[in-house]
């Protein structure tokens, strides 16, 4: 972490102060650690990333736990994670079934997270500074859904559209909503969180709506015919 530099943004605006009041329980810490791919990766989460200080929401680990709390407990009936339910219910299950190796790194500023899988590849998801300090809690939770979709063998298949904030013409978009790619999963999660998220605040739900609409406008080669 000594080679990483970052500035902690407003923790009320990001939702970290709100969610941080819940995660500082050994039961939650143990559950997140054993469920979402941290096990065996202490070396990636110590040395300033927060392993020694898991309740400090200035640090990456606690900020990750905040997003996992949202991912896990935002459905009113969160114990029901059946795939026949809305994505707000089953996103937690989808993430834990597809991500079993979660690592923290500084990154080079070009991505908030990356997934790696395939033959002769150490299957893993890496999280970078941009996720913890450039995203609010709802985007972080949805980033897990996005990367889990990649780990479920669904790559991006198109270029970003004209005017996209992600760089018009660059690779990394989904062709359309029906492709059911990572952007569709991420946007759908944010949509449901906005519509029915529980154990949260109205500000966090509005943030999810804002980001979901941003992805609809910018992350699909053919814009989906929806607005949140």
Residue ranges and their predicted role:
Residues 144:
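Substrate/cofactor-recognition hotspot
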Residues 147:
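Walker B catalytic acidic pair
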């Amino acid at each position: 972490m000594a080679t990483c530099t970052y500035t902690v943004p407003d923790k009320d605006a990001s939702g970290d102060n709100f969610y941080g009041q819940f995660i500082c329980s050994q039961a939650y810490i143990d559950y997140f650690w054993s469920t979402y791919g941290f096990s065996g990766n202490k070396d990636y989460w110590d040395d300033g990333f927060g392993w020694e200080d898991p309740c400090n929401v200035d640090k990456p680990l606690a900020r990750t736990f905040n997003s996992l709390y949202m991912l896990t407990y935002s459905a009113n009936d969160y114990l029901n994670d059946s795939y026949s339910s809305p994505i707000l219910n089953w996103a937690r299950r989808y993430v834990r079934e597809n991500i079993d190796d979660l690592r923290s790194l500084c990154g080079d500023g070009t991505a908030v997270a990356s997934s790696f899988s395939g033959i002769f590849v150490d299957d893993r998801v890496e999280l970078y500074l941009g996720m913890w300090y450039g995203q609010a809690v709802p985007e972080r939770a949805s980033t897990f859904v996005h990367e889990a979709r990649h780990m479920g063998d669904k790559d991006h298949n198109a270029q970003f559209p004209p005017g996209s904030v992600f760089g018009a013409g660059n690779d990394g978009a989904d062709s359309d909503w029906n492709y059911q790619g990572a952007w569709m999963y991420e946007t759908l999660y944010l949509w449901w969180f906005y519509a029915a998220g529980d154990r949260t605040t109205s500000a966090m739900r509005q943030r999810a709506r804002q980001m979901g609409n941003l992805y609809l406008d910018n992350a699909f080669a053919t814009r989906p015919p929806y607005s949140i």
